Amino acid sequence: MARERLKPSVAHDILRLSDAEKGENMFDGTYNDTVIDHFMSPRNAGTMPDADAEGSFGDSDCGDYLTLYLKVTNSVIREISFLVFGCAAAIASSSMTTVLAKGRTLEEAEAITEKEIADALGGLPEHKLHCSMLGVSALRNAIEAYRKSHPA
């Protein structure tokens, strides 16, 4: 697993460093093309300094940690972004969470499930299904924070 041979992107090197310790290789068939795409080119990644609300969630078992940022207009999520510390599945799940939530009402976004995220990614390995929980939990925490700071 020499990193010198595998330099298609910085993201790939990060994966090799983070998941290699767990004996995982993204390109061995463990992940489908959609998961790889959302890992290599995450949608809506980054902070949002002028966010209306933010919510976080961490998984103490694996160490993954996600923060989601929301901009809301008339109860609709107009902008959403994220920062995540985690494996490829956590990054891909976080990215897909933002794709699914953007443009939805708060109520619709709150109803997004772990299964919906995993299905939208085309599936996750059984031992990585918990990664979709990060998105659901952080999104619900962000929505709760928004409602507290913007009472109806």
Regions inferred by a protein language model and the residue ranges of each:
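C-terminal binding/interaction regions
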Residues: 2-49, 54-56, 78, 96, ...
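Short solvent-exposed loop/turn micro-motifs enriched in small/polar/acidic residues
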Residues: 50, 62-63
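Short, small-residue alpha-helix embedded
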Residues: 91-101
